[in-house]
């Protein structure tokens, strides 16, 4: 198997900005591991070896020096305890993970077991290791599956999932190895920011994390902010009137939609109509900024966001569908005003009102780990971005057995109707042989439409989409059964292998003779990684398998990004029943997909530029607050600014009580002022695009405003601390938290914000709208201005 490694080195030569990895060195280390044999050692002897390794590390021996012995030990114990002995490729992956790299391993190659070796090695230090899984189900599954290995070796293991109480979480994080999602770990980090007592902290200092489905978390979800919010008493805004106004608008007359269907903007006629109906006067006047923001949210909710595609309604709540996985994005919200607008659109009672107390993007949260590694089936295509954003290198791990999956050329059609008819016929023909089929769709709507058609044709199928993702493990486990037909939205990040013959592989031989799992994609996705992950569900561990994509020139991806304009128009006049066997068209579609990937990469970079300053400020505030909380930061503000009052209380209540009072007041106002600052930043960010009217750079202006506001916030913290201290009634028992209004929110909740990149791509449309509003000065002046603008735009 190790002979295949040389081919991996050659593959890296095809990539720009490559880093040459010494795969031969990995091979040498694996051979050293294989040369050590613990088969004749008793269980007691193996445990003694593990204890000796722990002592060596505590004495200061570098982890690299005990790697070979540690990995050999895990190899032997895994075979005894869970009946799984790591393959050589898994050992290679383990070495790379220990080195803090991202490994690309194909589906079914054993990422779960690969992570055990570096997790054990790094946990020997006693500082803790987090294995960050894709969802709660996998966190608990992997804990129960791999936990016995760690226990045998004398290390503790735990897991964290949603709905665990704080004490359960605290105990889990104190274990040597903790299985938890990146989201839950991040939420607990934010909860710690609100703690006023050290005993209430959940996390200990971060050490080392291994991230599963790394490209999904590090790239696709990198900019998604984790949020903790507290309850507020203010009433929500009633959107009914705005919804009524927006529903009266006519497309292409009162509003326009951009080419990517990302943004909607009012025309001059639409602007006049809204100003007349609402009676607000100039909609773009400064006093109407909040109304304008809400109106834009209603426009977005009504016109751009589609039920069953972008979200579903379940149990009276809006649940967002993740564009990459096709499943409900757990605890995900759009920014408050937009989410409230969607709730109003669907006639739901808004449950989103609250003040954001703290937030951090996944990208920055993961950087808090001093050492980070990752695993995924698709990393090579984003290796440059991983390097740029995280300084993470990628290592391609060869498969244990050669991949014999047959990937057929795409079937391309001019129209959706013919594509779907051919697709259904293909499924019928394959199903008649008993070969299991997995159909990957792009939306809930499409998955249900195909399932309905198949049922009409007498073909029973299982459906997995955002509406029933809690049944995911059960449905996927049986997708490889003889005769099974499974219709699913995107398979990315599912984390569950499809075994031929079903979960227990009862019909394995039968399915193998039929060609293994047959994967069908109903369209291309914005990222080729998603397509490749779908293909990768077939052909695991050297199994047979097949894959094929059915594409229409009317597919959303083709139309949305105008890939259709790259294809000669003569093909659009054909309503053929056969697919277009045309390599030129296929190349154009592939090229268009790469352009879209580049566009999305640029957007992620742009979002990073807007968030960088805020993140640096967050880091400063969190660090300062933590130092105060754990008594590493001396408190001298009150003794310096209010010396007379401070000395009086010092004599009255003593040093310890007075220190506790100052600490309580300080922590409260840091939280309060930071929450107010985040609210202000959100408000500024919503309207920052308007500065282009003054010919300013929006990014530079945003950074300038936030830096100035941050400095003001620091001053306000000091002022509020002093003011509270002067007014407070300090006794030997301290201060009455309730009476002095120093108590934080009575309840908090956590969620993620779908941080839309599109708010920064709508500048031309906003400029256009603002220019329309100039007619409030003078109709004659406006006509001249618009004529001038039109000439400039045409040029």
Swiss-Prot record:
Q: Which Pfam families match?
A: P-loop_SecA (PF21090), SecA_DEAD (PF07517), SecA_PP_bind (PF01043), SecA_SW (PF07516)
Cell location: Cell membrane; Cytoplasm
Summarize the protein's role.
Part of the Sec protein translocase complex. Interacts with the SecYEG preprotein conducting channel. Has a central role in coupling the hydrolysis of ATP to the transfer of proteins into and across the cell membrane, serving as an ATP-driven molecular motor driving the stepwise translocation of polypeptide chains across the membrane.
Its Enzyme Commission number(s) read: 7.4.2.8
Q: Which HAMAP family match?
A: SecA (MF_01382)
Q: Which CDD domains match?
A: DEXDc_SecA, SF2_C_secA
Identify the main location. membrane
The UniProt annotation places ATP binding at 90, 108-112, 497
Q: What's its top-level EC category?
A: translocase
Known partners and oligomeric status? Monomer and homodimer. Part of the essential Sec protein translocation apparatus which comprises SecA, SecYEG and auxiliary proteins SecDF. Other proteins may also be involved.
Tell me the keywords, alphabetical order.
Answer: ATP-binding, Cell membrane, Cytoplasm, Membrane, Nucleotide-binding, Protein transport, Translocase, Translocation, Transport
GO CC, one annotated term: cell envelope Sec protein transport complex
Q: Name one GO biological process term.
A: protein import
Enumerate the InterPro entries for this protein: Helicase_ATP-bd (IPR014001), Helicase_C-like (IPR001650), P-loop_NTPase (IPR027417), SecA (IPR000185), SecA_Actinobact-type (IPR026389), SecA_CS (IPR020937), SecA_DEAD (IPR011115), SecA_motor_DEAD (IPR014018)
Species: Alkaliphilus metalliredigens (strain QYMF)
Can you say what this protein is called? Protein translocase subunit SecA 2
User: Family per UniProt?
Assistant: Belongs to the SecA family.
Q: How does it sit in the membrane?
A: Peripheral membrane protein
Show the SMART domains listed in the entry: SecA_DEAD (SM00957), SecA_PP_bind (SM00958)
Q: What's one GO MF term for it?
A: ATP binding
Reactions the enzyme catalyzes: ATP + H2O + cellular proteinSide 1 = ADP + phosphate + cellular proteinSide 2
């Amino acid at each position: 198997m190790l002979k295949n490694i040389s081919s991996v080195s050659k593959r890296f030569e095809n990539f720009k900005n490559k880093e040459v990895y010494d795969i031969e060195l990995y091979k040498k280390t694996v051979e050293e591991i294989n040369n050590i044999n613990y088969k004749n050692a008793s269980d007691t002897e193996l445990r003694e070896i593990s204890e000796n390794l722990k002592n060596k590390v505590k004495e200061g021996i570098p982890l690299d020096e005990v790697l070979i012995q540690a990995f050999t030990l895990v190899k032997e114990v895994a075979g005894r305890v869970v009946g799984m002995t790591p393959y050589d490729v898994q050992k290679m992956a383990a070495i790379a993970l220990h080195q803090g790299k991202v490994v690309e391993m194909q589906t079914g190659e054993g990422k779960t077991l690969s992570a055990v070796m570096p997790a054990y090695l790094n946990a020997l230090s006693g500082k803790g290791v987090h294995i960050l899984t894709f969802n709660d189900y996998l966190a608990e599954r992997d804990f129960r599956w791999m936990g016995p290995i760690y226990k045998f070796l004398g290390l503790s293991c735990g897991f964290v999932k949603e709905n665990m109480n704080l004490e359960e979480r605290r105990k889990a994080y104190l274990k040597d190895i903790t299985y938890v999602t990146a989201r839950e770990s991040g939420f607990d980090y934010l909860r710690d920011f609100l703690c006023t007592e050290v005993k209430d902290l959940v996390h200990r200092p971060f050490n080392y994390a291994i991230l599963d489905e790394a490209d999904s978390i590090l790239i696709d979800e990198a900019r998604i902010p984790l949020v903790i919010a507290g309850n507020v008493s203010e009433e929500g805004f009633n959107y009914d009137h705005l919804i009524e106004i927006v529903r009266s608008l006519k497309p292409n007359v009162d509003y326009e939609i951009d080419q990517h269907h990302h943004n909607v903007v009012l025309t001059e006629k639409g602007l006049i109509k809204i100003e007349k109906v609402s009676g607000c006067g100039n909609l773009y006047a400064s006093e109407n900024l909040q109304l304008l923001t809400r109106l834009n949210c209603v426009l977005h909710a009504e016109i751009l966001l589609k039920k069953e595609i972008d979200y579903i309604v379940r149990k009276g709540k809006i649940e967002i569908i993740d564009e990459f996985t096709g499943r409900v994005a757990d605890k995900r919200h759009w920014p408050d005003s937009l989410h409230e607008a969607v709730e109003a659109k669907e006639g739901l009672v808004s449950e989103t009102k609250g003040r954001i107390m703290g937030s951090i993007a996944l990208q920055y949260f993961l950087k808090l780990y001093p050492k980070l590694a990752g695993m995924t089936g698709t990393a090579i295509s984003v290796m440059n971005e991983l390097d740029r954003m995280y300084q993470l290198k990628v290592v391609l791990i060869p498969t244990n057995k050669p991949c014999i999956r047959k990937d057929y050329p795409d079937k391309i059609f001019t129209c959706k109707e013919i594509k779907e008819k051919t697709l259904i016929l293909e499924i019928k023909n394959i199903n008649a042989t008993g070969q299991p089929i997995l159909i990957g769709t792009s939306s809930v709507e499409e998955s249900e439409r195909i399932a309905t058609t198949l049922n009409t044709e007498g073909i029973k199928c299982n459906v997995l989409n955002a509406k029933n993702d809690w049944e995911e493990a059960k449905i996927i486990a049986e997708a490889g059964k003889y005769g099974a037909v499974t219709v699913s939205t995107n398979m990315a990040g599912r984390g569950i292998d499809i075994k031929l013959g079903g979960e227990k592989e009862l019909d394995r031989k039968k399915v193998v003779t039929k060609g293994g799992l047959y994967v069908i994609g109903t369209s291309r996705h914005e990222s080729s990684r998603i397509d490749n992950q779908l293909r990768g569900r077939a052909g695991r561990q050297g199994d047979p398998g097949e894959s094929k994509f059915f594409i229409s020139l009317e597919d959303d991806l083709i139309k949305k990004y105008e890939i259709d304009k790259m294809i000669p128009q003569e093909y659009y006049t054909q309503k053929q029943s056969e697919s277009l066997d045309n390599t030129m068209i296929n190349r154009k579609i592939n090229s268009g997909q790469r352009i879209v990937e580049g566009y999305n990469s640029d957007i992620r970079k742009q979002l990073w530029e807007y968030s960088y300053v805020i993140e640096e400020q967050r880091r400063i505030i969190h660090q300062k607050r933590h130092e105060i909380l754990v008594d590493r930061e001396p408190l001298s503000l009150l003794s310096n600014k209010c010396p007379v009052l401070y000395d009086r209380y010092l004599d009255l209540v003593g040093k310890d009580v007075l220190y506790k009072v100052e600490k309580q007041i300080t922590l409260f106002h840091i939280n309060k002022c930071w929450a107010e600052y985040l609210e202000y930043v959100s408000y500024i960010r919503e309207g920052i695009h308007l500065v282009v009217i003054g010919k300013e750079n929006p990014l530079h202006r945003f950074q300038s405003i936030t830096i100035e506001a941050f400095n003001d916030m620091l001053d306000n913290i000091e002022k509020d601390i002093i003011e509270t201290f002067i007014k407070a009634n300090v006794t030997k028992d301290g201060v009455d938290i309730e009476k002095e209004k120093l108590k934080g929110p009575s309840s908090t909740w956590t969620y993620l914000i779908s941080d839309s990149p599109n708010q920064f791509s709508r500048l031309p449309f906003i400029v256009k709208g603002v220019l329309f509003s100039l007619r409030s000065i003078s109709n004659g002046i406006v006509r001249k201005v618009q004529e001038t603008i039109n000439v400039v735009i045409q040029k």
